[in-house]
A protein has these predicted regions:
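Secondary-structure transition/turn motif
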Residues: 140-141, 328-332, 365
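Iron-sulfur cluster-binding cysteine motifs and their immediate structural context
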Residues: 307-321, 339-356
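Extended beta-strand/beta-hairpin segments
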Residues: 319-323, 367-370
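Ferredoxin-type iron-sulfur electron-transfer modules in oxidoreductases and energy-metabolism complexes
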Residues: 321-331, 338
Length: 373
């Protein structure tokens, strides 16, 4: 919660931490920024590493304690090859890596007990491997299970780690169906703060096929999750949401060499976005921060494929020559509104910041990039 100066009840703010493998260390910086702003979430929700750190926060761990643990975090603390399984069971082995290191990490960060034992409500997403349906641990009927078991299951990336047993369910990584669980967290709160470190964008890359199984798998998974997530965000209504997207696309999913950088990026991105917190809290819905941009189309490059119109018919249309044009050249963009620009197959669409004063100049040089990233 965030205290109001006027003495009125503080708004109930839910915090959502998305999945993103080791990029999720940026969540630690985000939590630090929230602590400094004296924002205490009324509810936590998370997927994968976001679930682990959300559970740690709900267990009472501070960002400083998380930072200290992250600095000691080594590759062998997470990845130990399942040699026996790979040799003896071959294709029937459940995973490349052993369960025990990930399980030990979950046990270290998350308090013992069930969801009813936590000081703050927590929602952890996973997927039931047998029926293919998403599961939200912490919801009524799914609270009497060990939080550590739910967190492990939410982090159990298929093929990398064995599925986790939670109660009588066999579960895998929640990011398989919902990498940023804003929909499940948006109930019974007045506003949301969502930290998306995983799949805000899938930047163009070359040579992927030669970089091995893990790189190919994670890129394919990122494409799938990006499209699922973008649909949810483009259709978002209520409650109002502050969407923070730290710029971490240049860092690989499993890099141990950028821990401090990730924490710093998460901190700075969240601190910057929090300048719009009061505006977001005063709104009835929508996604923030919002910035004015000009949408410009290169008519020579435009092929008239209509993809931009299909994605954003409220913003784009085709003229009598079959070329795309903006219905409103000046638009009010949130971090979730740039997908139709990036999806243009010939890069004919640009969204340029409206430069009007010092504030928008600053946005153009830094914040604007984060808004449409």
């Amino acid at each position: 919660m965030r205290m109001n100066d006027g003495g009125s009840p503080p708004p109930r703010i839910g915090l959502v931490l998305g999945g993103g493998a080791l990029k999720g260390l940026a969540h630690i910086g985000a939590l630090k920024a929230l602590e400094e702003a004296r924002i205490t979430p009324a509810l936590y929700a998370g997927t994968s590493i976001g679930a682990m750190l959300a559970a740690a926060a709900a267990s009472g761990m501070t960002s400083a304690q998380m930072t200290e643990r992250a600095r000691r975090f080594r590759r062998k603390d997470l990845f130990r090859i399942n040699h026996v399984g790979m040799i003896m069971e071959r294709m029937q082995s459940p995973s490349i890596y052993l369960e025990s290191p990930l399980r030990a990490l979950s046990d270290e960060l998350v308090a013992e007990g069930t969801f009813d034992d936590l000081r703050v409500p927590l929602l952890v997403t996973a997927v039931d491997l047998e029926n293919g349906m998403p599961v939200v641990f912490g919801r009524p009927g799914l609270r009497d299970v060990r939080v550590r078991d739910a967190v492990y299951a939410s982090c159990a990336l298929p093929g990398f780690f064995p599925p986790g047993v939670v109660g009588n369910r066999m579960c895998i990584d929640g990011g398989t169906t919902d990498n940023l669980p804003v929909n499940i967290a948006g109930q019974n709160v007045d506003a949301l703060i969502a930290i998306d470190v995983g799949i805000a964008d899938v930047p163009a890359a070359s040579g992927i096929a030669s970089q091995g199984f893990a790189t190919i798998f994670m890129r394919a998974a990122a494409m799938m999750m990006h499209n699922q997530q973008q649909f949810a965000l483009e259709n978002w209504t209520t409650p109002p949401m502050l969407l923070v997207r730290p710029r971490v696309s240049h860092i690989s999913w499993f890099s141990f060499a950028h821990k401090e950088e990730l924490i710093k990026i998460g901190y700075e991105s969240t601190k910057d976005a929090l300048r719009d917190l009061d505006t977001m809290l005063a709104a009835k819905g929508g996604i923030y921060p919002r910035r004015a941009v000009h949408v410009v189309v290169d008519r020579v490059a435009c092929t008239g494929c209509g993809l931009c119109v299909a994605r954003r018919p409220d913003v784009m249309a085709l003229d009598e020559f079959g070329k795309a044009y903006p219905l409103k050249p000046k638009c009010d963009f949130s971090p979730a509104d740039g997908a139709f620009v990036r999806s243009c197959p010939v890069n004919a669409i640009k969204a340029q910041p409206v430069i009007a004063d010092e504030e928008t100049i600053r946005a153009a040089t830094g914040e604007y990039a984060a808004v449409i990233a």
